[in-house]
Amino acid sequence: MRFKIPFLPKPALVPVLRLQGGIGTSSRGLSDAGLAPLIERAFKSKPAAVALVINSPGGSPVQSSLIAARIRRLSLEKNVPVHAFVEDIAASGGYWLACAADQIWVDDSSILGSIGVIFSSFGFQDLMARQGVERRVVTAGKSKSFADPFLAQKPADIDRIRALQTPIHHAFIAHVKARRGARLADQDLFNADVWVGQQAVDLGLADGVAHLVPKMKALYGDKVCLQPLGQKRGLLSRLGVHMAEDMLSTVEERAMRAHFGM
């Protein structure tokens, strides 16, 4: 028979939420809809804190914003601090997620930053010409064939892409400034550059070099209870129905990581 001693304090509870992979709405991507149940659960049990383990090269700015906003809202509503621990990378949208935390911790070799916006595509017009293929397009609306990969790139298209990127970039910058505040260095941190480990700390993009378990023990006691929370794979996913989409998502994530030499 077990007896509970009521006056002994319970160990601090810290749910651990892993945010790994590209950010987007594919079956493998990190999305607000997919993560919402886990994020809500993390803040539900009156924890001492919530820990985010981040390993993401980025992705959708909208999903990054929605996920970060949900974390911030619950943190404020429940009065629960959030700590982010960056593993290999928190770049672009991955760093957007990290900034949802009150404090960001990194490894000596973690890559952080890439506070910018990118648009990439391919041009097939020369290949089509060599193969004798003619492109035929009929549109209603002069912008309907905007950035068509089968036509030569137009200066007007480049200008429009930059006009679309600018407000997204400004929103990203505003989020970083709001979350990091006076901790940021006075140099240009918003040119999409990246920094490693202690460099990121020195620039105010992170708060220190630390790993999950020892840092949580230092902050919340040796008996802190770290509770991993993970996404459950659906039946269709387990049966391999989404295999093609999963493979494409993996290729996309590897391409994003390759951009940072990973």
Q: What are these language model-derived features?
A:
Residues M1-D107, I118-M262:
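N-terminal organellar transit peptides
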Residues I111:
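Short glycine/proline-centered loop/turn elements that form peptide/ligand docking sites
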